[in-house]
Every structure is written in C-alpha cells, then in structure tokens.
Amino acid sequence: MNSVLIPRVRFACKLTFAILGALVLGFYLQLETPRWSAMTAAIVTSGPALAAGGEPFAGAIRHRGFLRVIGTFIGCIAALVIVIATARAPVVMLLLCCIWAGVCTWWSSLVRIENSYALGLAGYTALIIVVTSASSPLQTPQFAVERCSEIVIGICCAIVADLLFSPRSIKKDIDRAVSQLMLDQFALMRICVNSGTKEEIDKSWNNLVKSTTALNGMRGSLMMESSRWQRCNRRLKALHSTSLSMITQACETYLIMQSSPERVSPELKALFAEPAENVADVHRRLKQLRQMITGMHSDNVLMTVSAWTGAGTRALLLMKGIQTNSSISAIESGVLDGEVVVRPVSAERHHALVNGLRTFTATTIGCLMWLWTGWTSASGCVIIIAVVTSLAMRTPNPKGMAMDFIIGMLLAIPVGSMMFMLIMPATQQSLFLLCLMLGIFTFFIGIEVTKRRLGMLGLLAGTINILVLSNPMVFNVTSFLDNAMGQAIGTVIAMAVLLIVRDKSREKTGRTLLNRFMSSAVSALTTKAYRRRENHLPALYHQLNQLLVMFPNDIGKYRLALMLIIAHQRMKLAEVPVNDELSAFHKKIRNTADHVVSASGEGKRTYYYQRLLKELGEYQEKLVEYDAPLKVTEPVRRLTDMLQRYQHAFLA
C-alpha cells in the first residue's frame, strides 16, 4: 500500500509546487497572463505522469520542458512571420495559421514520438499568438515575447520541483529488466529446441519482443537523467540489437526443428532440458554450450544454435557492464562498434496526412465560426481546438485523448464556477489564500492523474485557464461563463472532426509494413561488405511492434513478418559468391522490391511483385550456375516459396 501511495503523494506535492511556484513568480514579475506559466508547469509536469500511469522517472519532465521551449520558440517565429506578411488580410492570416498547425501535426506524426511534442506545440503556439493579437497586430512581438517568458518560467518551476521532490531513477528498473531479459531469452530457446507448441512460441516471443522494446525505451529515459550514463546507454543500445538477434535465431531454430529435429544433438538438447532459475544459471549453461560446440564438428552444429550462443555470451558481457557502469573494455568496444544500426522509416505517411488534415479542418472551422459570429470567446475556442487536435494526434488513441479533454472541460465548468464565484472572492485578494486554495485542488488532481483517471488532465488545464488569474482579480461572471463554454465547445468540435474525418489507413499501413519486411529480406542479398555491416533488426522489430499494435488479433501477420525477419537475417549471413553479374542482379532485385513498396495502385504493385518473383527464379538459376553452396541457395529458395505462397498478403 505504502509503495503505491508514497510516489503518488510525492508527485502530487511536485505538481502543486510547480504550479504555485510558476503562479507566484508570474505575479512577482508582473506578467500579462501569469496563468499561462501555471498552465505550462501543469502540463509539463502532469503529461509524463499520465503517460506513465504513475510518477515519471527522473529526466522525463526536463526533457518535455526543453521540447516545449523549442516548440514555443518555433511557433513564435512562425507567428511573427505570418503576421508581418499578412497583417492587412486577417482571413488569410488565420488560414495560414491553420495550415501551419496542420503541417506541424502531419510532421509530428512522422518523426520519433519522443520528439514530436515540440512540433505539435509549434503548431498551436503560432495560432495562440495570432488569435490573441488579432485585434492589435502591432503588439504581436510583445505577445510573442510574453508567451516565451511565461513558458520558460513555467518550465523552470517544473524542473525545480522535479529536482526537489526526489525524482525516481530508472536505473534499478533497467538492472532488473536486463536480468529478466536473459532468463526470458533462455526460456524461448528452450521451447524452440524442445519443439514446443505454436501457442507457447507465440506467447514467449511476443512477450520477449515487448520487453526488449520496453528496455530500449528505458534507455532514452536513462539518458534524460544524467550524462554519466553514457557508457550504459551504449551498452543498452548494443544489447537491444543483440536481444533481437537472439530472438530471431531462436525462432529460426524452431522452424528448422519442425522439419529436421535430428539437426540438434541429444547432448545439446540436454542443456535445454531444465529451465534456468537465475542469471548465474544462464551463464553456466552458455559456458557448457560453448565448450560442447567447440568440441563438435561445425557441420554437426546447427548454425542458429551456435550464433545464439555467441550472442548470449555477448549479452551477458553487456549486462555486467550495464549493471556496474564500468569503463568499456577492449572486448566490449569490439561488440559495441561491430555494426551500424539503420533507423526505421515511417510507414504511416497516409495516417500522418489524415492527422494533419484533421487539425487543419478543426482549426479552420473554429476560425470561420469566430469570423462569422463575432463571439467574444470564440478565440479561446479556436485555441482549445488547436491544442486538443495537436496533442491528441500524437497518441495511439486520439479519440481517447479527445474524450479526456471533453470530460475535463465539462467538469471544469462546475469546479471552476465554485472556485471563481465562492472560494476566490473569500480570499480577499490574498496571495497566500489563493495559493492555499489552488494548492489543495492541485494536490488531489495530482493523485488522480497518476491513476490515469479519465478527464483529470483536462480538468486541471481547463480550470486554470478559465479562472483568468490576475492581480488585482476581476470577478466578471459573464466573461467567466463565456470562456468556460468556449473551451468546452472547442473540445466538442475537435472530437466531432475526429469522428467525421476518419482514418482508414490501417489496412494500407499494414500492407506497407509487410512489403517492407519483404523488401528488407530481398535487399539483404549482397556481396558488399559495408551492406553486411548494416543492422536492420531494430528497424524491422520496430515495424513488427507497429503490426502488434495495429492488428492485435491477427497472429498470421505476426508469423509472416517474423518469417521474413528470419529470412533477412539468413540472407545477410549467406556467403554469396563475389561476382559482378550477381552483384548487378542484387541491385536489380532491390530496385524491383522498392517499386513493390512504393507502388500506389494495385495494378502496378501486382506487376512489380510478379516481376520480383520472376527475377528471384532467374537468380536461383544464376546461383546454381556459379556453384553457390547450399547455405546460399536454400534460403533463397525458401524465401521465393514464401513470397509465392503468401502473395495475397502483400498485394491485398
């Protein structure tokens, strides 16, 4: 009980300190709108907690704060450029802001998720500044400077609060995860060698892929904590690739055992007879495997088992370095510098385009409503629309995030009304009483945010926004209710646009991912040494994880993707005869595979796919002509048969 309650109370204190510190500092520096600094502190502090479902690890708040500063400065510069260029045409000015917000949302959907926050923020910051200064364009530079000042103050307060209230380090969690990873790797190989059921294999490798991906995500959080983890970061990056390699080799062993169970000797099987109890047990078994493999003839040892043993040995070496954070030895240096990791290319281009279109459409509707009705609070409505659509588009569940804002903004009306009409007038302009009232409210909201309670983040931001905190405080009830209704209507409009502009890119993205798996397997055929050093496994498993998220119940897609990853790894290790004609054929096959991936219509895709199958058939004949060994011809034949058998999955 205490282990759960203490982090929640600590985070609630952190959130309260950050918001109150930003508010008091804003009043002290006589900022125009000190509530923006308080809102910044609230969003920067509570956002990572909502995503983590608890107190965020050390560094997460600082990283988010720096991204917010970058996004704010980019948005301010964009706003100044738009106003200077179109100050005499207000409609064009607002239209350009809507286009800018849509472009930023589109771009944020294509880049890495941890960096997309800055782009999303840049989109709606420009809109906020332009809308705020619409009545007096000459004051736009002043609004931009004030906006940046408020953001920086809010972020500084959030960082100070994060440092004061014992930020939780992720290092211990990484050490535990690394140890468990080695046990899970041995468990998967044990199931594969002993020819377990497909259900056991699917469950084991699925969990192992998820834990490997999670460990790589922890690596980013660790680097946010301190620069002293640089060595640990390098080892974790190498361990990620090594772990994926071990998963691939274990699954290939299973496929080989299904057709040729005699390929693994009884002596080797005996070492996988019993499960490993701890890391020391895994270390002992790997040592026995190395000794046994060394004493056997290479033709009698399955290549995947030998490669898995070597990768496991490297993983244990990296694990020890991760847990001690010691200096990198010469042996480790060879492991760390062995391969060049290739970054994945986004397959969600159509999805990103839909996200940008949603943001543009929603903000345009808000601006048109503002221009048509002349509603005094329509500007606040437009701002909320931009904020909700920009932030929601970056999440795996945009509708869920939008619903969180709707519930929060609706709850903010009664909660904010009680605070504005009853509690705040009773404070009699006392800053201490105001901070006490807001502190109690923020503390309980902070506890609920760590529980991922629906609507709490929206309630916190919405309440701070509609209170319009100023010094001295002006209690205009009509203006308050107008602002409250404006932000509530804005969230409803944003949700309506999300429902109307549907994202139908799921099937297209899934087919693109499968075609990229196919292309990577075919492209692994090479005689070039530099191409063999390229490590595509992290990118391939990243795309496999996307398939897991998009098609959680389609096990057939996972198995097909995994077989293509195995084919890629086998092709990469194949010793293709060095020959100019074969090298030219490799280039030709890669070019055709790229056309299959990039083909826009079904007709073109089918044409290039059939051409690829024909070229692979000709390539097999060339391999026989140049006396290629069975270790080369057999993987090519298996890949060709697989592409022939499952061509409906790549073309449908």
From Swiss-Prot:
Give the record's keywords alphabetically.
Cell inner membrane, Cell membrane, Membrane, Transmembrane, Transmembrane helix, Transport
Q: Which GO terms describe its molecular function?
A: transmembrane transporter activity
Q: Where is the signal peptide?
A: none
Query: Which Gene Ontology BP annotations are present?
Result: carboxylic acid transport
Listed GO CC annotations? plasma membrane
Classify the source by domain of life. Answer: Bacteria
The record's principal subcellular location, in a coarse class, is membrane
Q: Where in the cell is it found?
A: Cell inner membrane
What is this entry's stated membrane topology?
A: Multi-pass membrane protein
The UniProt function text for this chain reads:
Forms an efflux pump with AaeA. Could function as a metabolic relief valve, allowing to eliminate certain compounds when they accumulate to high levels in the cell.
What name has this protein been given in UniProt? p-hydroxybenzoic acid efflux pump subunit AaeB
